Amino acid sequence: FIPSVAGLLMEKELAHLGKVLEKPEKPFVVIIGGAKVTDKIGIIENLLDTVDTILIGGGMANTFLLAEGNMIGKSLVEEEKVDLAREILEEAKKLNVNILLPVDCVTAFGLEDKEGIETCLVSQVKDDKMILDIGPETVKLYEKQLKNAKTVVWNGPMGVFEIDEFSHGTEGVAKAVANSEAFSIVGGGDSMAALKKVGLSYKITHISTGGGASLEFLEGKVLPGIEALNDKEYDKSRRPVIIGNWKMHMNKNDTKNFF
């Protein structure tokens, strides 16, 4: 039998993501966005020992802003994660990791509100409004950090990207990542869509198509598909195959049923 091996796409994913985990060139900047802290907390915790700067945006930034004592109106927030966000901010300080949060934001009464859109400092969010994007000053702040970065990982939008009025922050970050000279990895549907929209996908070192599997890998988790490839003693009677797809989420039983 021929040995079981990873396909070329899977090999490429592991090579690029592995470089970030093992020995990233400094300064190492991570940009994390999206709606929930829950979805990305594992990445932040796993990279705290190696990252220099973390830039946070999207709905999850609201939880961190609240942890710092900011009033965020009717914005999306995970109240049960506020203490965890505060702990992460404190741990980052101990490790000399710079976590940057939005300094200004785009607000409105709701997703469909076009008349009440306004930009304000995060300290001036009105009680009846929602934060729906990072503001222009935050984009400039994040651009400054990315300009001198040598390694950049970006996953998640900075606002409600699918609505044009709240897509400018994500687009601004996309341009900043693409125009940096860093080794760059971008993952997540909205992040990739932003790059495509501004026509700069070609300037990214690696666009990850691993989805949830790549996130788990960055969290430091052992992925079943990789474990099975490395497990020389497991079920020696099995028929070895070449796996040519990005199916690292599959466990051994899932893989057996798949084939």
Residues covered by each model-derived region:
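Active-site loop-to-helix "anion-binding N-cap" substructures in soluble metabolic enzymes
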Residues: 1-259
